[in-house]
């Protein structure tokens, strides 16, 4: 990823002239499954350690693996949707786990103050939706006009994972090999 030269036009990897599978039952269900799984993991880690992790890269890797295992062709758009739905989990959870305990502590100190779970759920949901809605107007600006000018390492890494998965073959082999080595290392460290 590099800044565009003066007068150079940005050409997206997925051509706007073609029709790709993107938002469908497959991608939405897998995205929701990833959001649930990584929300639980992020909430546990956040409450235990006080820090949440960003789930975009692991979800991108899982999306590529699941699509490859299901032998889905032209799955880049679907994988982007899976990754986008799933990756919101860490952000929403972080907002909730750092504020909800404080509200319950305040309720313990001031019994007249009530904390309703449904209100907290709706406020978290609306916060996520508003965040997406406020970001939509900036999408074209950051993707097309400011392409390569800002170092967004996580977004760049997620994009590389998704593109490598779409190309398959030799591009995806280092990802698989690195994942196996990492899993083996983690197994050895956790077991012995």
Tell me what each language-model feature is:
Residues 1-192:
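Alpha-helical multipass membrane-protein architecture
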């Amino acid at each position: 990823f590099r800044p565009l030269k003066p007068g150079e036009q940005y050409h997206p990897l997925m051509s706007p002239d073609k029709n790709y599978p993107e938002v469908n039952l497959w991608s939405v269900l897998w995205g929701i499954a990833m959001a649930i799984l990584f929300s639980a993991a992020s909430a546990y880690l956040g409450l235990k350690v006080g820090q949440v992790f960003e789930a975009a890269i692991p979800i991108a890797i899982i999306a590529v693996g699941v699509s490859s295992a299901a032998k889905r062709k032209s799955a880049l758009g679907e994988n982007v949707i899976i990754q986008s739905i799933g990756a919101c989990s860490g952000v929403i959870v972080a907002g909730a786990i750092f504020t909800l305990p404080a509200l319950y502590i305040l309720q313990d100190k001031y019994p007249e103050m009530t904390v309703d779970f449904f209100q907290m759920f709706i406020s978290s949901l609306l916060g996520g939706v508003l965040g997406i809605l406020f970001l939509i107007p900036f999408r074209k600006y950051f993707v097309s006009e400011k392409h390569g000018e800002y170092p967004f390492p996580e977004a760049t890494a997620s994009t590389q994972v998704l593109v490598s998965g779409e190309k398959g073959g030799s591009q995806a082999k280092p990802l698989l090999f690195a994942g196996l080595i990492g899993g083996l290392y983690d197994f050895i460290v956790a077991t012995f």
